[in-house]
Amino acid sequence: MIIRLAILVWMMATSLFGDGLADLKNTLEKLNNRQPIRAQVKALTSSVTTEDKKATQASGSMEVTVDHNSSGVRILWSQDDLDRVRDEAVKGLKNPNLPNPLRGLMNSFNATTMDSLLAHSDDLLRTLSVSQLLSETPEARNGQTLRKLKFKVNKPLTEANRKSMKSYVDELTLWIDENGLPVASEEKTELKGSRFFIGFETSSVIKRSFRRVGDRLIVSDFESSSSNAVSVMGTNSSTSRFIVTVN
């Protein structure tokens, strides 16, 4: 009886919402990312590298102003942050073992990443074009009834990568509202393989929260955590986050 009731509820919810994947694609295709936007983008990073049983930690944060309009992408750094990066470089000349998280953060503010954060509908459509829908179920999330879509992502791999891999998994979960607008996503990847008799493992989880601003789907919160292990070199784990604010 309980099982039948659960199936009935699921069928009613599915009937009410319609085809989630079709709604998602239709909504994304209507977002043409043309309206000018200015955003504050804050990046935070932390990492732990273990080599010869010795752990090295590094962390940092930086904030920039990003303009995205018909002229392209413009990224504005503050003079204080430029000075911080220069100071870090000077200290690195005196001690090459010092971590340099600020330079890495500055490099993360590239046009490709900023475009993905402020005009994400195109990125998501490309991912969907190489993905297979596995399931669609209703789910309550933060007090809102959403549709949960699970995908297997089949991104193309080079012949060399295929030969070196033992296993590879890439799964994407999307939560969309009644109109097909993405609310959040989570992508998990796991890879195991070997090359030249050296084994390696890597895994990552990327979480995104979305917000519609005009004709844009922006990523208001992006959080990535990853870990890598190479049999003869040690391990590395890192987390990074972008927080996007639009006035």
Give the positions of each predicted feature.
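Hydrophobic h-region of N-terminal signal peptides that target proteins for export
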Residues: 10-18
